[in-house]
């Protein structure tokens, strides 16, 4: 059974050093590509919610061709919480 998309977004960030919304969309489009929620606005909302809840941390941001990219990581305590509450 497939995880809810918000869970998959958090789990993905635990598997990489850092990720922006575009990275997450690219990584999850194989499994969630038909979901209307796999878009930049919804993914950013999930990433910011993860940050607000203490699971993720913003690492950096940059402008690429007029597009703001905000990168997040799951620090060790965040990874631990995510992996505890969202099993593989």
Where do the language-model regions lie?
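Short acidic, hydrophobic short linear motifs in intrinsically disordered regions
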Residues: 19-29
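General structural signal for alpha-helix termini and helix-helix connectors
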Residues: 11, 15, 30-34, 62
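Short, amphipathic alpha-helical interaction segments positioned at domain boundaries
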Residues: 70-88
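Short, Lys/Arg-rich nucleic-acid/phosphate-binding segment
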Residues: 60-70
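A short, conserved structural fragment
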Residues: 51-62
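Short alpha-helical segments that sit at the start of domains
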Residues: 1-18
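Short, hydrophobic-biased segments on the C-terminal half of alpha helices
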Residues: 44-51
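Short, positively charged loop/turn segments that connect secondary-structure elements
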Residues: 29-44
């Amino acid at each position: 059974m497939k995880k809810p998309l918000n869970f998959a977004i958090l789990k993905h960030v635990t598997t990489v050093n850092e990720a922006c919304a575009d990275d997450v969309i690219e990584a999850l489009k194989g499994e969630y590509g038909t979901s209307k929620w796999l878009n930049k606005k919804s993914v950013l909302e999930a990433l910011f919610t993860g940050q607000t809840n203490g699971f993720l941390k913003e690492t950096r941001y940059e402008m690429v061709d007029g597009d703001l990219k905000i990168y997040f990581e799951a620090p060790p305590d965040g990874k631990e919480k995510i992996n505890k509450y969202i099993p593989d």
